[in-house]
Amino acid sequence: MLKKSIGIFYRCFYLNNKCDYYLIFLAPFSLFTQIFMVITALISVANSGQMSLIWFTNFDTFTYQSNSLAIFLVWYYFLNHKSRWFENSSLVLSVTGYLVFTVIFFNFYALSRFTGIVNIEPDVQGWFSTITTQLPYSFNGSFINDWNAFSELLLHVIHPLFYFIYVGLLFKTYKFIKPPRNLQSFLLKAGIYPSIYAFYLQTIPFLNVWDNGENSYSVYGFFTQTKYNSYVWIWSIPIFASMFLILWMLFVINNHYYGKKHHK
């Protein structure tokens, strides 16, 4: 019985190399991040009295979903590294692309706020959106403000950075993980989730969620308000296309790196 228990423990932790040792740190930290997101959503509910805010403004954001996918991937690999999903790098590249997109666009938004290029007025903030007048990453001593600031830092800098280190170690350590060979097939499969999410962004303002006749719920306020803002399509299409550009770049980098490793 003892030998069997030790065997199960060993299969779960596979302490064979740097990547496996790093997972001993990353797996619990990722779990902490997921719990932190749940607590943040519950705080939103407590402050507003709106139970629906567990989903709206929290788990319906690309930030929460891309981080959650990365957390799921880490734990799935941690517990089942021999799964057929890891026979090639398609899944890892896809999730990495989603998180890269999150990091780039939120930090671009943060930079635009700090430089004054974007100023958040009530009409930009929207109605129950994730856009607030609070500057990103700004701590001021208020519990709610500081909690939100740390949440932004955790989900847009700290956790993504630790995840990217894991991906780097994974590809450096396990040379047998083959890259996807067909770009069109890879983009088609990897693009399913962001396409569904984009459809959600475009349709939620029309579903009469907190609709007062002049504004309605939009995940990112003015920037995704398709019902009351006719200009939203100007930036929506290129932003959506940039997701596929990121996935294409990861595909090219991965194939080039894999080729170099196997022709030494």
Swiss-Prot record:
Disruption phenotype: Probably essential, it was not disrupted in a global transposon mutagenesis study. Keywords: Cell membrane, Membrane, Transmembrane, Transmembrane helix. It is found in: Cell membrane. It is a multi-pass membrane protein. This is Uncharacterized protein MG133. It holds the Pfam family DUF1600. The lineage of its organism: Bacteria, Bacillati, Mycoplasmatota, Mycoplasmoidales, Mycoplasmoidaceae. It comes from the Bacteria. The keyword Iron does not apply. GO terms for cellular component: plasma membrane. The chain crosses the membrane at residues 23-43, 59-79, 91-111, 150-170, 190-210, 233-253. It comes from Mycoplasma genitalium (strain ATCC 33530 / DSM 19775 / NCTC 10195 / G37).
